[in-house]
Amino acid sequence: MAESRKMKTEKGLALVPGANPLADGCNFAVEVPEDSRASLILYKKRSAKPYVEIPFTEENRTGNVYAMYIPDFNLKEYEYNFLINGKVYTDPYAYRILGRERFGAEVGTNPHKVRGGFLKKEVFDWENDKNPAIPYHEMILYKLHVRGYTKANRTITGTKGTFQALEEMIPYWKELGINTIELMPAYEFMESGTCKNSESEKMVSEKHTQGRVNFWGYMYGYYFAPKRSYCATDDPEKEFKTFIKKLHQAGIACIMEMYFPRECNPVTALRALQFWKLYYRVDGFHVLGEGVSAKLLMHDGVLSDTRLMFHDFDESQIRKKKKPEDKCIAQYNPGFLQDMRRFLKSDEDMVSAAAYHIRRNPNIYAVINYMACQDGFTMNDMVTYNYRHNEANQENNHDGSSYNYSWNCGVEGPSRRLQIRQMRERQIRNAFLMVLLSQGVPMIYGGGEFGNSQNGNNNAYCQDNQVGWIDWKALKKNESLFQFVKNAIAFRKEHPILHVPGEMYGVDYQTRGLPDVSLHGERAWYMNSENTSRLLGIMYCGAYAHRADGSEDASIYVAYNFHWEDRIFALPNLAGYRKWKKVIDTSAVKENGFLEQEQETYSKKLKVTPRTIVVLMAVEEEKKDASVAAL
């Protein structure tokens, strides 16, 4: 162990866990099990051996927390660990983790290889940085894996798979129309085999020590440290702050996904979120796991204006805002994926569920709608495979969900048949419109906008390779899909009636002549919800939303036909000289869905081809001259 060296110590502050600079010294605090012995281990930088071991005394103890203050402590000279009951313990509150610089590398059996580091005292130049403050009703959310997103992108000039590489993607996101990025776990976690006697890393499961890695990172982690192997430089703090600053300069917000398992202390989760918000200026969090208290986070003053996303929570515990546009809480909505995929593939009895999900937008919290995520098929694979193909995960294809609610359009896997390929392309266009024309927050899983595939693997948690990495060659191959998604995002943004701040009621409560939203079908003003029905018409009254210039939005009618035959929709009458004009048709291959030159108008009936979504917009027709009309 360490040589016998003396360092002056004092009783520290137990309220602040971890290693924190204080005056001219450093405060060390660690929580230990009852009746435990503990020491602080200090290492000289880049030294393989401990420099000194300083035992905590009973005088340092408050409850189960040992706290020690070392005056005149030079942070630049040292790294540290704790020793608890004879086992080396890397501080879960460490602001920097040393020894995990290369992703997936085994750390061996040396318990001193992984250790904690300190925050830098240098002031970072934020250059008048400001939170973009994207309200939920204007948010276009884009989720990605930091490493997998750029690892196979040949256009990246820097180190691929890093925060620095993501900076190069900002113009791409701006072109697509994205204004909020969500990062899958980007704090330090133990993706590969660990040293056998490192107590702090005991939660790595056995299967990740057998040649595979936990690529995603949904496990216990070091929640205060940016992941070192996601950095191109030796300065994780500066690199991550620079990434956030450049996002904000581009008007893009950043959401961090954080997973807290059952054994995690809810207070640790709270402190972690507060830290990332205050120190790194992160804009929000997608919180997962059983080790969190949603109520604790929702009622914290520091997080009161922070976007917080959960999969489940007690609605009555939400701290309500004065206006729907100010809401900060959101629910990730897997029900949307399940029901809308079933509607897309023409399952029975899905019309009522589809109508619910498309309109759902509560006043006190938002809903995040998506058709693909990391946990399941990609958008491309959803229309290419009926069954999971997870053999590469080395679990005999038993892992991953058996319920994918997918339809391969007649052939399992890639096909050269034109009819199959065209149907798949149409179904992907349909899926994106389902997400982008729903009232909730649309979420796109990175790469889906140009048909990225995982070859049917619906659980690529361990695939740090071409399966788990985004295939950027598909962007050129599927350029038309990218353009369609880009246009669909722009269409959503242009029409505020498609994303109002709060709930729509289905009544004309402002006496505008039409309800704010209404349901239709083969009969106007009537939705057929019988189990055999596979079509739905939704009309939005544009007078209930205003554009940035104060003008009323246009009324919009969306016809969903997922029958395998043509269907005739009866259109509601419009007042005055207005008629319906077709602006989007997912079956229009030549025009790539968007009908800019369309001149025909509709007033009574609309024929929609099989498995197609059509969007109509109310337009003013020229008034006929009365003298001419009398002839």
Describe each model-derived feature in a short phrase.
Residues 1-25, 51-53, 60-143, 150-155:
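The feature marks proteins involved in alpha-glucan
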